[in-house]
Amino acid sequence: MTVRESAARTAAPSRGTWLEHEPLAGHTSWRVGGPAERFYQPADLDDLVQFLRALSPQEPLFWLGLGSNVLVRDGGIRGTVVCTKNRLRVIEARGPACVYAEAGIPCAHVARFCTERDWVGAEFLAGIPGTLGGALAMNAGAFGGETWSLVRRVLTVNRGGRTIWRAPEEFEVGYRHVQGPEGEWFVAAELELAPGDGRAGRERIKALLARRSATQPTHQPSCGSVFRNPPSDFAARLIEACGLKGHTVGGAQVSLKHANFIVNSGDATAADIETLIAEVRDRVALLCGVWLEPEVRIVGEAQA
């Protein structure tokens, strides 16, 4: 028995979902990606803690939320994928204008929860197509707001299953960047809002979503923005200036609606998308002298 086989057998959770060779195309917003060697969805936070305590320290781990902002290669992911989608969804009020939300909660749900209680400041979260855990991990933002501007404190878990409350000061936070203690993952956060007009907040959410629908390819599989905006410019402007709107590789296409989106036209592979990302980056570098940094994470094994 290999180390990984042993890890899989000893760590199989008692209450969560445990699958082997689970195709990840159904768990990513691009609708591409090979299989996870092992795939685990916790029943709740306590189940996750028990799972990690039983897991071999040699077992590779990858954390997945709604599967946006990530490109899983066609060969899939070795080790165990911990998927919080539709799990870790507890959300509750914690005192005046403070919300506790677990990592698997969609950002849009957090925004609605707050405005329903006449708390404002989180409306921009409705424009982030991912979970709170993913938003915390990269300081996701939309429409001028950034996730960590709301954070009072975060709850992390380490490989040994220990949960730790940490203050924002313990992290290096920047534009689409968060760095903290090694070997810990976000499982919840307390967010601080401001008392306000919930009805007006809901109207702002409605307006933001209408703007998003008008400017982004929301009805096609994508990961959200592919590249970070360079200083004092916009990735979409540079890509469009290079004549790349509509450019395709296989089933992957630079969106005709928003140049910083790559969409799956129906039959794209992860390899198509990765090749298109590289072609766009190289063309912008050649014609504009700007090296675009990917916002999307590219993970997993290439197809053998």
Curated annotation (Swiss-Prot):
Residues 31-196 form the FAD-binding PCMH-type domain. One of its GO terms (molecular function) is FAD binding. One of its GO terms (biological process) is regulation of cell shape. Its cofactor is FAD. SUPFAM superfamilies: FAD-binding/transporter-associated domain-like, Uridine diphospho-N-Acetylenolpyruvylglucosamine reductase, MurB, C-terminal domain. Its main location: cytoplasm. Pathway: Cell wall biogenesis; peptidoglycan biosynthesis. GO terms for cellular component: cytosol. Keywords: Cell cycle, Cell division, Cell shape, Cell wall biogenesis/degradation, Cytoplasm, FAD, Flavoprotein, NADP, Oxidoreductase, Peptidoglycan synthesis. The keyword Metal-binding does not apply. Its EC number is 1.3.1.98. It catalyses: UDP-N-acetyl-alpha-D-muramate + NADP(+) = UDP-N-acetyl-3-O-(1-carboxyvinyl)-alpha-D-glucosamine + NADPH + H(+). It is found in: Cytoplasm. The active site is at residues 176, 225, 295. It comes from the Bacteria. It is an enzyme of class 1 (oxidoreductase). Cell wall formation. Belongs to the MurB family. This is UDP-N-acetylenolpyruvoylglucosamine reductase.
